[in-house]
Amino acid sequence: MKKFLIGTTLLLIPSFLGAIAEETSRYYLSIGGGIALPNDIDGDSNLGGTNYDHKFSTNLSDNYAVGLGYKLKDWRLEFNYSTGKVQTDKITSNVRSSIVPNLKRDVNSYMAYGYKDFNGESKVTPYFGAGIGIATISTEDQKISVVNAFHYTHAGDDATVLSYGLKAGIDYEIVDNTSIFTEGTYQNFGSYKAEKSGARTVNYDASSQFTILTGIKFNF
C-alpha cells in the first residue's frame, strides 16, 4: 500500500507541472469538519519481565482540516493540515488488565496531496487524491494493572511518524469561486515507540482511520 501511494503521488506531479504552461494558477482555501472512524490500536509492552500484547478499542471522534491548494485545469496540489483526538474505552491484553486513564491520542497531520478532478458540464465535480506527509501523535502516561495485582506505568510520549492517505470526494459549486465538498479519507500512521524514564515502554503498531468530512472551498 505504501509503495502504491508514493508511486501514485509521483505520477500526479509530472501531470500537474505540465499543466503550468497552459493555464494561469488558481489558489484555493478549504475548511472542513467531520468524524473519524479509527481502527483499534495494537501495541505491546514488557511488564515485570513478561511481554504483553494489548488492543485498545477506539471510539468515533471529531476531525477538522484546513487545506491550501493550487489548481491547474483538472489537477490540484494541496497542503493539508488536520487535527483530531483518538479516544479508547477499553484495553484487552493476554491476561486480565485495566488501565487508567483510557488511552487518548492527539493526532495532527501535515500532508501534501495531489488530486485529479473529473470535470463535466454540471456543477458537480468528483475527485480522487493521494498524499504523503507526517503526523505527530501525543499520549499521556497511563496506570496499567495486570490481573489486579501488579501495577505499572505505561509511558506517554510525543512522536512523529510517516503518514500516507487516499481521498475521494465530490465538490459542488454554489456560486462563482465558492463550493462545498464532502470527502472520505483513508489515512495510515506509522508505528512508533512511546518511552520515558521511570515508565514502561509501549511499542505501538501502525494504525489507520477513515474520515468523513464536509466543508467549504474558496477559490482566489
For every predicted segment, state its role:
Residues 1-26:
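Cleavable N-terminal export/targeting peptides
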Residues 29-35, 79-83, 128-134, 170, ...:
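Transmembrane beta-barrel strands of outer-membrane/channel proteins
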Residues 41-50, 88-97, 138-149, 193-200:
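Outer-membrane beta-barrel translocator domains and adjoining extracellular loop/strand segments
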Residues 22, 67-144, 209-220:
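Gram-negative (and chloroplast) outer-membrane scaffold detector with strong preference
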Residues 81-82, 86, 90, 174-220:
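Predominantly the C-terminal beta-signal and adjacent terminal strand-loop region
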Residues 19-71, 139, 211, 217-219:
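Short glycine/proline- and aromatic-enriched beta-strand/turn motifs that initiate or cap beta-hairpins
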